[in-house]
Amino acid sequence: TMKKITFLLAAMLFITTVETNAQDASRECTIKYNLFKGDFQSKKFDDAYTNWIFLMDNCKDLSVNIYKFGATLAEEVRKDPVLAQRVYDQRLQYFPTKNPAKVHSDYATYLFENKLASDDAVFKILEKGYAIDPTKMGVKNLYIYFQGVTDRNKDTNPQKVFDTYDDVLENVNIKLAGYAKKLIKYNDS
């Protein structure tokens, strides 16, 4: 019985230690996140960067804002394509349901505008976004996607080109209708 008591005490001590360490890590993530967000919004990008890297390494699923703001840090402030790729990959891994079509579209735009990937690689990313929800993609990317479909199918499958044209046009119209609604709401306020 003495062995049982010793074992139970050791087990409880271990569980308490694990729980406390998890709470400390969670608390540290929250503190670093708040510092990061405040620094980012104040445009103190160097300070934000340090906390952001900590969040990217240790608190990957804390908030989608780590990736929304992080994309700006990686692409516009640091101009670091490797970091931008990491933001893209981790955001899709940890927040797969938070607007993935737009994430694909935005990343394709970044690669395309900075000439960091081949047209084929950009098309493949746009294809993923289009398959999820074309209305979440930018109009320019819908055009680039359509151009990619045309280039790949004009000689072998013209019907696919026509079908894609109709589909893209419909999605552009949906986007434009959405913009019109926002303008009306904005003008009414």
Per-region residue spans from a language model:
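Bacterial Sec-dependent N-terminal signal peptides
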Residues: 1-26, 71
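Preference for long, solvent-exposed alpha-helical segments and helix-linker "stalks"
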Residues: 23-189
